[in-house]
Design a protein with these regions (language model features):
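Surface-exposed interaction regions that form or flank ligand-binding interfaces
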Residues: 1-74, 81-86, 97, 106, ...
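Short glycine-enriched loops at secondary-structure junctions
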Residues: 92-95
Length: 220
């Protein structure tokens, strides 16, 4: 009798196990969805560099968390170092219609009838550039730091955008338009060493601090 009961319950326990596995899988996906979404955009930019900027003089640094003058932190998606300038790249893996201009504090993403607000990425990158200006003040002039905003191809701009805001790989031509050597090889090495020295080690602590910093900026 016991053996028969176990045989009857075995498929039930097996099904319950799969349901629990699916439940936790969905939960984990939802928790990490914003992180994964951001990473997909960053991977796309890294792929653009590999495919279209094959000159070894271009050096791509990814996902840098740096301290600012207030003791807070700022996270930079990409830094592209080159003799022609330093390109500070903010990626946005957003789809749908995008509304915004250079001066607006908040931009809008519209997908069908749903609208979502997000921080102006130009303002975000301005903060990144100011941190870099201070960090590299004795090595490179501020006007050699260039802001680049990259949305994914699924985004559609519904308002005119500044000339440094792009979809997909369009930003590559902008970078290539800078073709005059402005930074020596020695200075590029110094910049790399300075960044390696100042960048914060990746950890859950720095991630939490960055999230809190973003929340505070949105509220201010």
């Amino acid at each position: 009798m016991e053996h028969s009961t176990i045989q009857l319950l075995s498929p039930l326990w097996s099904s319950l196990g799969w349901i629990l596995l699916l439940f936790f899988g969905v939960l984990i996906f939802k928790l990490f969805k914003p992180f994964l979404k951001g990473k997909l955009g960053e991977f796309a930019v890294a792929a653009h560099v590999t495919l279209y900027l094959k000159d070894p003089q271009y050096i791509l640094l990814n996902d840098l968390t740096l301290p600012d003058e207030t003791g807070a932190t700022t996270q930079i998606d990409h830094l592209l170092l080159s003799p022609y300038g330093i390109f500070v790249i903010e990626t946005k893996n957003y789809k749908g219609w995008i509304f915004g201009n250079e001066r607006q504090k908040i931009w809008t993403q519209k997908i069908y009838k749903n609208s979502y607000k997000f921080q102006n990425p130009i303002h975000q990158n301005y903060k990144h550039i100011k941190v870099l200006e201070q960090l590299l003040a004795d090595i490179v002039e501020p006007d050699l730091l260039h802001s680049v905003i990259v949305f994914m191809p699924d985004a559609v701009f519904k308002t005119p955008m500044p000339n440094h805001v792009f979809r997909g790989a369009g930003w590559i031509d902008y970078v290539k338009s800078f073709d005059q050597q402005m930074i020596s090889e020695t200075k590029l090495k110094r910049i790399q060493l300075r960044l390696e020295k100042e960048v914060l080690e990746k950890s859950w602590k720095t991630n939490r601090e960055q999230v809190e910093n973003l929340k505070q900026r949105k509220q201010s």
